[in-house]
Amino acid sequence: MDYLKVLVEEIHSVVVATVDETGHPHTFVMDMMWEDGKTVYFLTADFKPLYKRLKEDERVALTGMTQRAGTMDRKSISLTGQVEWIGKEHLGELLDANPYMYEIYPTEEGRSHLQVFHFKKAVGDFYDLTQLPPYQARFEIEG
């Protein structure tokens, strides 16, 4: 199964956990925007607290699940690992795959603040309740 494709195309929105400089946890909702078969990519604006936290500490955990009618129709993925800031690299691919970003950031100046990250190393857990017994699998990202 292509877990990265499930994460980007079926789940898309996830809750991301980071820690601040004092070790306090923070969570954010964000979209997993693109995958290349090896890793997943996302972006944030350089004026947001999330950007600062990711630049200071690359450790991240996230969880997301598909939004279907009932619990037994859902799949979930959790990732724990390290992200890497890659600046504007692949920004065009992320924007092309997620055209709603042009509504959120309608001007070139607004989009100039967007910064791309990807997982450089992570362990993932996949859980599928659409079949019984539930299917579970572990996978790794070595971006």
Residue ranges, per PLM feature:
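A short mixed-secondary-structure module that forms the rim of ligand-binding clefts
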Residues: 33-71
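A structural signal for short hydrophobic beta-strand segments in well-ordered beta-sheet cores
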Residues: 32-33, 83
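A short, aromatic/hydrophobic, helix- or strand-capping loop or linear motif
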Residues: 18-20, 64-67, 106-112
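Short connector loops at helix/strand junctions that flank enzyme active sites
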Residues: 9-11, 27, 35-37, 55-59, ...
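A short, Trp-centered hydrophobic/proline-enriched beta-strand micro-motif
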Residues: 6-21, 60-64
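Charged, amphipathic alpha-helical segments
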Residues: 1-2, 44-50, 100-103
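Charged, gly/pro-rich active-site loop segments
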Residues: 75-143
